[in-house]
Amino acid sequence: HWFDDVHAQDHLQALAAGLGEPLDAHTAALWLELARALRGTPRHLSQHVGGFVLTEDKLTRLVPVEPAAMKGRSIIQWDKDDLDAMDLLKVDVLALGMLSALRRCFDARAALRGERWDLADIPREDEATYDMICRADTVGVFQIESRAQMSMLPRLLPREFYDLVVQVAIVRPGPIQGGMVQPYLQARERRRQLRKENSKAQLPIEYPKLGKALERTLGVPIFQEQVMQIAIDGAGFTAGEADELRRSMAAWKRKGGVHRFEDKLKDGLKDAGYPPEFADRLFQQILGFGEYGFPESHAYSFAMLAYASSWLKRHEPACFLAALLDSQPMGFYPPSQLVQDARRHGVRVLPVDAVASGVDCTLEGPLAPIRGVRAPQPAVRLGLRLVAGLGRAAAGRLVQAREAGAFASAEDLALRARLDRHEMQALAAADALRALSGHRRQQMWDAAAQLRAPPLLQDAPFGEAALALPAAPEGEDILFDYAATGLTLRRHPLALLRERLARLRVATALQLRAVPQGRRVRACGIVTVRQRPGSAQGTMFITLEDETGPVNVIVWPALLERWREALLRSRLLAVEGVWQCTRAPGAGVPVRHLVLQRCRDLTGMLGRLAGVLEGSRDFH
């Protein structure tokens, strides 16, 4: 910046003189001092998505308020630190999409089973649910569905509720950067070995005097509350000082606040007889919380939702899928992957249909058994809400018109539901008029002929002679499926390319499951997720999907720049590398990854499909 120069004052005076506003040396120095003080200060207001300030008196008498960018809304000019300094109460009211999904799932289950449930009614400590979790079979489940969580599940092997509390908390930047993950997993393995001889054996922790703080997590601090308790029990902190320590840990975007407690903590532990290496290790773990860690209470509430969603996925998969689709956008996976996963688990999914679909996804009989699921399951009928270009109001009119009587034709539907040509074309593109018009090309022809009739002619039938068109090839139908609804119930796109991929010696995700550790392999799939978390030190994680399932790819930083263009831009990616297949002690399933050595962008093989596939979900 210009004012960093050693001659900044001379430059400023010359600039001012050129503008016709000369400055003396003293005034110029004051301007420079002010400019330096303002460096790094935000110059705009960013609205908190769910922050509310509650006051006894009128808010505008206490804090400065200005109009927000959105019409009819106001925003406070102070941030949370300003409010805290003034002892004003701020409450963050944040939404979780999974809460909506669970409510919808309970509603669907009540209609199906004839009994109303809420969270408290879900059976506790269900063995089949934990078996599913330990297999990392958690697509769509709250919190434990990400790549990192799925990799941790077969290592941590949750078998009871508190294990889930730790699970949702340990895969966070704080515990990872603080070096808490491996010590905790090692402690769990030591306890597992102990319990082979005595099922009720408790693992002794290194310092029994800190048992109140550390016993429940096997001697490794995972939560902020534990650090507070150690500071009180081991280092002589008062409750107020421990709370200040917690607040400094919670301010994870502002570095350095924890260091003011370093000497007091280490000296206090030393005076209490703890070795210096323990104090150093503990403080390093505390520093990890500065990279974002969970309070235990937060982890408990998240674990409850993780368990509830896992139970429903395991025992009511049809209700669960319908609820997830109706709650989009949310979660880690797009609707196409949620549907693919549900179908692999035996759930029957029926297409959008103007003569059968509701606005939302619905359940349809007859009930049929699914392997491994106790209760017979209905099919899931995709809802009109999934049709791109068809608004909720138009979908509602369609359903309302259908309740008065079955549609005789596409023309009859358009007239009675008051749908214009664009809305009819949206239905046709989604293959939702098949029962009325036949195959998709015929639907598109019929939809193109529809014009909204003037009021006096809405009940007057008119038309022209039907034209018979040939049906579209499968590839074209798949293209339209993705463009119109974001998913397909036909074959996966890679099934159409499998013969060409086989000539490139590319294995499917299913075939890779039988490949031993260390083998050099090739895989190819549609890129569904890209991740490059800060805690991974530059490593990128990519998920590919083919017709048999997902393949997880690891890209080390040294190779990221070499293959950057293909890794960041490809929709269809072929990867060659070393197959990793490791099994944790006691784990039923291994953790599988493909470590990239080279890759190739094969997006061109998708043709026009590449332009309509939903983009990958990228996280940083």
Predicted segments, located by residue:
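Low-complexity, acidic/Ser/Thr- and charged residue-rich accessory regions of DNA metabolism proteins
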Residues: 2-94, 353-357, 366, 370, ...
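Alpha-helical scaffold/interaction cores of sigma-54-like transcription cofactors
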Residues: 1-441, 448-452, 531-535
